[in-house]
Every structure is written in C-alpha cells, then in structure tokens.
Amino acid sequence: MDDLLKVPEIVTNIASYLSTVDYLSFQQVNKRVYAIINGKNDSKYWSLKLTRMGLQQVHSNEEEEITLLDENDNQNSLRIFEIYKSFTAQNSKKIFVKFYRCYNSYARKLYNNNLANFFPTSYSNDPLKQTRILNFIKKYNFSNKNDIETFTRIETNFNILREIFINSVLKESELNYQSNNLAAVARFMKILLISNEESNAIEFFKSKADLPPSLTVLPSNDELFWAEQPREEDSGGSTVIFNSKNLDTFLNQLRDFLNEKIKLADILFKDEFPVILQFIESFIQDILLDILNNILLSYSEFLKENGKDSKANYECVPELYFTFIKKFDTELNDSVNAGANFRKVVRDLLNLYLEPFVVNYMNQTTRVFESLINSQLANYDTQVQDKQREQNAKIYNTLKDQTDASSASNNELPNDLSIITETSKTVPEADSKPSTIHQSVHSTDISNDKLDFLSSFTKIFKFSNNENQRLKQQLQLAYNLNLISNNLQNIKSLISLDLCYKILQETSEKTDQIYKFHTIESLLPLIKLRCQEIFKILITQLNKNHVKPAFEKAILLLQKYNPNEIEQIEIKFNSLSPANTQVEPLVQFTELINIGDIILQMISIFYKNELIPKKIIDKNKDFLNDVIQLKKNFETSIDDFVAEGLNIGINKLMDEISFVFKTLQLPDDYNPPPPSRNSPIRDIKPTKCAIRVVELLSNHCFLLTGATDKGTIDVYQQEIGERFFNEIVKHLKKCFISTEGAIWLICDLNYFYDFIANKLKQKNVVPYFVGLKSIGQLYIISGKDSKELGKLISDLGKFNGIFTQEEIYEFVQRRSDWVRVRKDVEKVMYGLGIRDCCIM
C-alpha cells in the first residue's frame, strides 16, 4: 500500500473521488501524499467542486481579495450564491469553505435521512425562504458528484423532502383558494415557480379554470339560424346566416369565462409566468374548435331540413371567424400576465387553429363560384333559345294560319294575296337613335319600282304551279326570310349586359369575402391566389360561355345575310295588315360591339379599383402574371371579333352599294337622250342613286360612335371610305357617259366628295375623292376638243396622283363618243396614231 501511495498519478486519482471530509483526512496520511496533493492538484480539486455548483472559474495572476461573510449571519445561506458567482484557482478553497459552512449541515441531515426540523427556526414559517434553501442545497450537492455514493444518497432523500414540500404547498394553495384568499395563493404559486414546478402551477390554475359543461351547449337550430337569410347592409351584400342575438348570447358566456380566468392569472402569476397564453391556446384547441365543428354540423342539418345543399355549410365560416375574433380577441380584457403583445398573440393563435376552416372556405367559394357563373350563363342561353323557338313558332304559325285561311276560301290564289318586298334599314339619326326607311312596291317612284321588281323577280319563277305546293313554298320562303330577319334583330340580345353586370357584382362580392381574411398573414399568398382565380373564372366564363359564342353567332348571321335578296315577305289576307320586320345587321352588331366595350370597361374598372389597390396583383410585376395575360387575351379576342364582324359588315354594305349602283343607276343618268320639245327640264343635282348611296353610307359610317374607341372608329371609317372609292371606280368603268350627262356625274362626284370631306372627315381618304372629282373633267370636254382631252389625260397632276395614266385611259374609254375622239386622244398621248405608221 505504501508503495502505491508513492505514485503521484494514483494518489491524485484517489483524491479526486473522495468526499470533502475524506479528502482532508487523506491529505494527513503522510508527508509524501500531502506533497503530491497540495499545490495545483489541491486547487484543481476545489475548483472542480465549485464548477459543479455552477460557479465560473476566471483566470487571474493575483489572488483576489475575499469578502468574508459573518459566520453568525443566518441569511448567508440565502445570499451566498448571489455573492460568489466566480472564482480563481487561488481562492477556490476559501470560497468553497463558505459554501460548506452554509449547506453542509443540510447535506448531513439528508445523508442521514434526518428530515425532522430540517430548517432552522428562522426559516420554519417562511416557505419562500425554504424554497430558495432547497434550490441551493440541490446546487450544493452537485459538488459531491465525485463521491457518487454520497451524492446519490443525498439526492434521493432531497427528492423525498422536496416532494413533501411541494405537496404541502399545493395543499395550502387549495385551502387558501377555497377561502378566496387569492393573495396567499399567489405567494404559493410564486413558490412553485421558484421551485421550477411550472407544470404543477399550470395544472393548479387549470383545475380552477374548468369550463362548466352548460356553457358549451349550443342553442337549437331554430334559435341559432335564420330560416330566411336577410341581407346585411354593412356586410357588402352578403347574407346573414346566424341569429346574431342568440349567437352573441352564447359566445358572451364563453368570453366572460375567459375574462375571469385572465383576471385570475393576473392575480396568481402577475407578469412572472405567462400561464394565460397556454390556457387560451388549450381553450381554443379543445373548446372553440369543438364548438365551431358543432355549429358547422348543425348548419348542415339546418340546410338539409330546409331543402338546401348541406355541403354549403362552409358559407357560415366568415361570420363565425370574425365573430370569434371579436369575442375572443377584441373583447377580451388586457392581461398583465400575457404582456403587451397579448392581443396579437391571441389573434395569431386563433388564426392558427381557424386557418384550415378559412382555407376550406376559400377553396369551396372558388369552386362554387365557377359552378354558379357557369349555371347562370347556361340558364341565360337556354332562355334565349327558348325565346327564339317561341318567336320562330309564332312566325311560322302566323304565316301558316294566313296560308290555310287563304287556301280554304278559294282554290285559286286569292286576289288579296301579295308578296311584298320591303327593304328596311335602321340608321342613326343625329341623336344616334334608330330610324327606319321603308320602300314599298306601291311607290310611284320609277327607280324604287325597278329595284322592287328586280328583287321579287329572282324568286317568282321558283313557285310551283300547284296551288298547295305553291302556298307551301311561299310559306317556307316567308318563314325563312322572317327567321333571318328576326335573328339579325336579336343579335344584341346574344350578350346580356345585365347578366354580365350581375356576374361582375358577384365577382366583387366573392373577392371581398375572401380578401377579408387578409389579416391572416400566413394565408396572404393563398388569399391573393384565390382572388386571382375568381377574376380568372370571371374572364374565362364570360369569354368561353357568353361573349365568344355571341360574337361567333353574330358573325355567322352577318355572313349569311344577303342584302340583295328579299328582306321581307308578307302574305296578306283580308284585313290582316303587314308586319314591319327590320333587317339591320350592322346596327345590331354595332350595339353588340357597344355592349362588349362596356363589359371590357367594367372589367378594367374592377381590375383597377379592386385588384390593384388591394395588391392582389402587383402592378409593377403584372406582366409576369397569367391573370393579366388572360385579361389581355380576352380583350384581343373581342377586338378580333369586332374586326371580323365589321369587315363582314363593310362587305355587306359594299354589296348593297353595288346593288344600288346596278339597280338605281339608270342608263340615261349619265347618258341622257337628245332633248325634245316635250321632254321635261332636268334639274342639275345628284342622281337618286348617289343620294341613296350617301344615305346608306351616312347610316352606317357613324354606327360605332360612342360604342368603341376612336382608333377603331377611324379604321372602320377609313376602310369604308377606301372601299367605297373602289366601288365608285368599278361602277364608273361600267357606265356610258356623254358630254351632256357629265354634269350629273360631276354632281354625284361632288356629292360623294362633300360627304367624305365634310361629314366623314377622314383625312387619309379625302385625297382619293379629290382625284375622283377630277375624273368628271374627262367627260365634260366636248368631242370637238379631243386634243385638249388628250392633254388632260397626260397631265397626271390634275388627278392628285391617285390614278395612273392607264387607269385614266380606262375612264376616258367610257365616253359615249369614244369611237370618234379616240384617234385624236391617242395621238396626243402617244405622239402618233395608227394611221400615221408608214408601215401600216
């Protein structure tokens, strides 16, 4: 044994496992052991004990001055850990001696399991001091960890003592709570917190905050919900689901219960331990969510009882959410225990647990909104089709009744049966209101008679000689033409502005309902996404199921419309008067354009006033958003339809102008017969054909005014002007024009120019008609001045650069005396005539 103690490592290792008393005794074994342990090894032993107690070792070259405590001071045990928080290797033993003198007596009692009269008399009636002493004893015992047997024995008995102490504290807390001595209970709660018994403190508080079962019993469905949901003025047009009075009464009890517990927590814990937040979270999770689910279930049953879709119970989520926020956040009392951010934390907790319900509401709202819009548009389409079928049946039955009556009265075709060809056009007056111009077969006007005759003539030979078959063919023809006319009149009804406005209102309401939840920060990206989906549904449904089909049908009707066919056929019998049916494709299509433009403007207003201010769409990054692309595609689609429809309309207008030129422009308009003694004097003014053509132009060129943007109007009017110019050119190249008739040609050309320059006012088109006016000079020059005529043809500047010399040559060929003047004209133009060729 003596040999072992001569080895320093063995001596040092043995010393490190000894208790304080044994270590001091081991130093006294012999001088050699003392020499080995003393010095740095001794400082290391005491430093390790202090470190295990929680003190911090600092490095210093000089030994610090130790403030000695009065050994007779009974308060040393309560203050020593506050005084000594650090040490150096040099003073470690001296500092440990101070702790040893304070707590070793307690450690010996615990080691010997002597728990009776454990605390000194001065601490016996002060549980708060006892708590602090117990905490310090536990820390002190860590210094014995090198002697595991001593440490474990003391630790075991300490835990027994501490458990007895905690139980006595809880018992005293209960007794004082029952006697309503909350101040005493608060002191005991503080003892539990100092003892690191937060869980016991929380459980004690929860045991005094149990919710009475009666407060969770919901009112009956009849008391809680409205059978007929009234509108609420302040709710943005949404319906009120709950009986607010009964719902408030029910929730107010829960709110008052929470306020009582907030007050209790403030008394018992003050701001030392935030027990109320944990309690409120448990209340939300265990009570409020259960109540919310029960309300949703009750509402489903209520809907089912009232013959409605029970799956629509999600509709009550917004009202419940904001009511819960109001009752269990806004109307809660301030809490000292929870701190200054109490309300924010409570709202965050409410949002956390209510978030799944809100997400489901937004998802369901988006899905149902799409279904609703689709249903509304489908219903409107069905109504339009039903109405159209009724109108078609009415037209057919009316015509059939007339035909049957005629057939029954006489086997021959009745004298009063007539096929009336009537041309009616609706054109804008100065105030943009439609006016109808009628042309009747009974007119004495020769030109109108000719037009009506030629129009009817194309059909009359198609009728069978068999009387019944003939009447059937007449009926079928009349029905088809009245049907086309009726369809054209109904073009503007293909799009319902009222329905679109209603859908936009519903879109705004749904967007507002979803955006109300924007205070839930974690849901803000999803809220924006759902609002964008609502807007996308609006555009997609309107385009796919309403606007696009309407324009496609309107364009199809325009394509089928032939202004040169019979526009109205009426079968009259006895006293039946003719019906006035108007065919006005461009007018009706223009109104459709106007409606489409209004819809686009409403969508743009909604976008600018709803989506941008609420930052649902970032205007600085909108080019990256598919919503904006969808909106632009919708606008482009309407623009394309408008362009296509207007192009077709212009084609039909040009066809009609061409028809007027062919039918109303009499051969003697520009090539009158030689005057005789009995022939009337003809006024120098535009021909009836020119007047009718300008009337058609006037009725159609200004249809778009106020219906769309100025750029579209300008393009439309310029296109009409240019194509009208081409129609005049083609028409003139087919006419024979005499020197005597040239004066009326010039009148017509001036009349056309006046309309283009002073009414249409499209600067790009005016030069064409300036050049066209000069064409009249080709015919006013007498045949005797044929050389002057040749010079005029060669002077291209006279025609404003509009026509080439070849085109002017074509015009001059329409002179009635061209055969006589041709030689002189060509000689001036080309220098030599054919007869001047010596070879010929």
Curated annotation (Swiss-Prot):
The modification Phosphoserine is found at S409. Residues 1-48 form the F-box domain. It is found in: Cytoplasm; Bud neck; Cell tip. GO terms for biological process: early endosome to Golgi transport; endocytic recycling; endocytosis; exocytosis; Golgi to plasma membrane transport; protein transport. Pfam families: Sec10_HB (PF07393). GO terms for molecular function: SNARE binding. Keywords: Cytoplasm, Phosphoprotein, Protein transport, Transport. InterPro entries: Sec10-like (IPR009976), Sec10_HB (IPR048627). GO terms for cellular component: cell tip; cellular bud; cellular bud neck; cytosol; endosome; exocyst; Golgi apparatus; site of polarized growth. Involved in recycling plasma membrane proteins internalized by endocytosis. Required for recycling of the v-SNARE SNC1. Interacts with SKP1. Present with 2700 molecules/cell in log phase SD medium. This is Recyclin-1. It comes from Saccharomyces cerevisiae (strain ATCC 204508 / S288c) (Baker's yeast). The gene is RCY1.
